[in-house]
């Protein structure tokens, strides 16, 4: 189809100087034999300005050597995408071959093209990894809605928005304590916090050694708790008199001061107090410092002679155990632990099924081994509940050996139990690994990037109308694309030109103040 400019359309000329429609039924005899040559039919009306790019013409898309063909109106359903916007896709056009060339993943484009053909349905091909397909969605600029649909179809959780405080000072403080990568001081605060956590964990472990436990009056057994409590209450010597001068207590106090300061600062600087209070990591921070204040209150009460030490030591033994949860504070500064937590959270359904299958297997095989071993007096399976431990150890392939079947029937049941355990545990593993890979690439995609550039096709383009007409005569570029260029889509005044050499000749490329606009830049996110 030839595009005829509007100012060159032929107007009908009426015979004898009069205007009107040509005679119906052919040229009249009275008008002369040349009457038919004076009238030419008008060409079809050109599309409106908003419909120029959505004609029914076909377009060829070359993906790393594999050619796809579709209609322009199919691509124009999504004008905000790379293929749907003529200005965006023009830089990838090769007028010599009359096609768009993309050096991208070929299997992924089947799903990308189906997205346009189906009106917005996105489906990942089974032979394309999740991280590669998500990169293709970003490259073709399908938008956040398509990305959310893709993640939802893959079974991933929606990413939670993390707003920042509105006030400048509050935002700076929040960034310092919540985002270690935001600045150097924030990284320094994170390092100090990690060191304090490690010191607290080391102190928690060292104070249980026998030599240090004696100094701190740390009983080795519950009976010794009561015995020493009775002696102290009889003699009237307060057990907490020397606790405040103990080195472990001093170091613990310094650690708690830092934990409390960090928690309070983050609480007052957070953008939402309600969200802060519901965060599991903040709850762990609170649980990590509560045992210290309970212990301190108990020590002060005993020092004044108002406490019941026999009861307090038993309670404090449990309270001190809670201090071990401080190790989870490291997950705030470790992306690996965060990824593991997100993976477990996203895989709760699979983990629930695993526990359910294990529960069924434990009941089944513990009952079977009990009845198989019931006739042997030397068997250790005295009841079905006693066999629960053996079934769990066998299905998880641990095999402590403290309980084992001795009869032929019991050994057969044990073999089946081990095989069933291997199959049960192996079933949800691929799903959990897939979730881990997704969260790992999502967390690390901004850290390690490698860029490579390949030559685009914009050296073939020129803003000169004369060169466009020459290219039109040598290729079959669709009229829609030329209309876009001629009407200012690639205007010379809006996009300055930069010459560059290709072989022995010099080509011209529009740069839009960006030296990389003439090449297709792809970011590959790698993991370490």
UniProtKB/Swiss-Prot annotation:
All ranges on the Cytoplasmic side of the membrane: 1-187, 270-280, 335-350, 435-528
GO biological process: protein homooligomerization
Main subcellular location of this protein, as a coarse class: membrane
Gene Ontology MF term list: voltage-gated potassium channel activity
UniProt keywords, alphabetically: Cell membrane, Glycoprotein, Ion channel, Ion transport, Lipoprotein, Membrane, Palmitate, Phosphoprotein, Potassium, Potassium channel, Potassium transport, Transmembrane, Transmembrane helix, Transport, Voltage-gated channel
Residues annotated with Phosphoserine modification: 473
A GO CC term attached to the entry: plasma membrane
Motif range (PDZ-binding): 526-528
Biased composition (Gly residues): 15-32
Region (Interaction with KCNE4): 435-528
Catalytic reaction(s) noted: K(+)(in) = K(+)(out)
Post-translational modification: N-glycosylation promotes the cell surface expression.
Modified residues (Phosphotyrosine): 452
Listed SUPFAM superfamilies: POZ domain, Voltage-gated potassium channels
Segments for region (Disordered): 1-32
Cell compartments where the protein resides: Cell membrane
Sugar-bearing residue positions: 232
Family: Belongs to the potassium channel family. A (Shaker) (TC 1.A.1.2) subfamily. Kv1.3/KCNA3 sub-subfamily.
Subunit architecture: Homotetramer. Forms heterooligomers with KCNE4 which inhibits KCNA3 activity by impairing localization to the cell membrane. The stoichiometry of KCNA3 and KCNE4 in the heterooligomers are 4:1, 4:2, 4:3 or 4:4 respectively. Increasing the number of KCNE4 subunits steadily slows the activation KCNA3 and decreases its abundance at the cell membrane. However, a single subunit of KCNE4 is sufficient for the cooperative enhancement of the inactivating function of the channel. Interacts with SEC24D; this interaction is reduced in the presence of KCNE4.
Role noted for this protein: Mediates the voltage-dependent potassium ion permeability of excitable membranes. Assuming opened or closed conformations in response to the voltage difference across the membrane, the protein forms a potassium-selective channel through which potassium ions may pass in accordance with their electrochemical gradient.
Domain statement: The N-terminus may be important in determining the rate of inactivation of the channel while the tail may play a role in modulation of channel activity and/or targeting of the channel to specific subcellular compartments.
Protein name in the entry: Potassium voltage-gated channel subfamily A member 3
Organism: Mus musculus
Lineage: Eukaryota, Metazoa, Chordata, Craniata, Vertebrata
Gene: Kcna3
């Amino acid at each position: 189809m030839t595009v005829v400019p509007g100012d060159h359309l032929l107007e009908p000329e009426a015979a004898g100087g009069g205007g009107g429609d040509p005679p119906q039924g052919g040229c009249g005899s009275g008008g002369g034999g040349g009457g038919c040559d004076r009238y030419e039919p008008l060409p079809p009306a050109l599309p409106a300005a908003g419909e120029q790019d959505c004609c029914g013409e076909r377009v060829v898309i070359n993906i790393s050597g594999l050619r796809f063909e579709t209609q322009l109106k199919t691509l124009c359903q999504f004008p905000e995408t790379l293929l749907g916007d003529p200005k965006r896709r023009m830089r990838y056009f090769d007028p010599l071959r009359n096609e768009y060339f993309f050096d991208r993943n070929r299997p992924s484009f089947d799903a990308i093209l189906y997205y346009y053909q189906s009106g917005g349905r996105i489906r990942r091909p089974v032979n394309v990894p999740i991280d590669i397909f998500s990169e293709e969605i970003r490259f073709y600029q399908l938008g956040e809605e398509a990305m959310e649909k893709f993640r939802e179809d893959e079974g991933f959780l929606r990413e939670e928005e993390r707003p920042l405080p509105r006030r400048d000072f509050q935002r700076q403080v929040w960034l310092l304590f919540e985002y270690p990568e935001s600045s150097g001081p924030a990284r320094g605060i994170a390092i100090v916090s990690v060191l304090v956590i490690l010191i607290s964990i080391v102190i928690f472990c060292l104070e249980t050694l026998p030599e240090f436990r004696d100094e701190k009056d740390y009983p080795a057994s519950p009976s010794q708790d009561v015995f020493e409590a009775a002696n102290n209450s009889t003699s009237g010597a307060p057990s907490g008199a020397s606790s405040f001068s103990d080195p472990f207590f001093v170091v613990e106090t310094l650690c708690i001061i830092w934990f409390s300061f960090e928690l309070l600062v983050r609480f007052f600087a957070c953008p939402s107090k309600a969200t802060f209070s519901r965060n599991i990591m903040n709850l762990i921070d609170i649980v990590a410092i509560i045992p210290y204040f309970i212990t301190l209150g108990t020590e002060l009460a005993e020092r004044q002679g108002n406490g019941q030490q026999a009861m307090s030591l038993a309670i404090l033994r449990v309270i001190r155990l809670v201090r071990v949860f401080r190790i989870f504070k490291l997950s705030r500064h470790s992306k690996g632990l965060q990824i593991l937590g997100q993976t477990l959270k996203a895989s709760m359904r699979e983990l629930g099924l695993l526990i359910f299958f294990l529960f069924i297997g434990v009941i089944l095989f513990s009952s079977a081994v009990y009845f198989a071993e019931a006739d042997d007096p030397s068997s250790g399976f005295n009841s079905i509940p006693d066999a629960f431990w053996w079934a769990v150890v066998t299905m998880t392939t641990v095999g402590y050996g403290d309980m084992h079947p001795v009869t032929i029937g019991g050994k057969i049941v044990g073999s089946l139990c081990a095989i069933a355990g291997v199959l049960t545990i192996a079933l949800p593993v691929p799903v959990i690994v897939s979730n881990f890979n997704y969260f790992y690439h999502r967390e690390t995609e901004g850290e390690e990037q490698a860029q490579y550039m390949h030559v685009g096709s914009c050296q073939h383009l020129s803003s000169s109308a004369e060169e466009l007409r020459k290219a039109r005569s040598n290729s079959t570029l669709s009229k829609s694309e030329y209309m876009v260029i001629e009407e200012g889509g690639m205007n010379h005044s809006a996009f300055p030109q930069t010459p560059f050499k290709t072989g022995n000749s010099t080509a011209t490329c529009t740069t839009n103040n960006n030296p990389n606009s003439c090449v297709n830049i792809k970011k590959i996110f790698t993991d370490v």
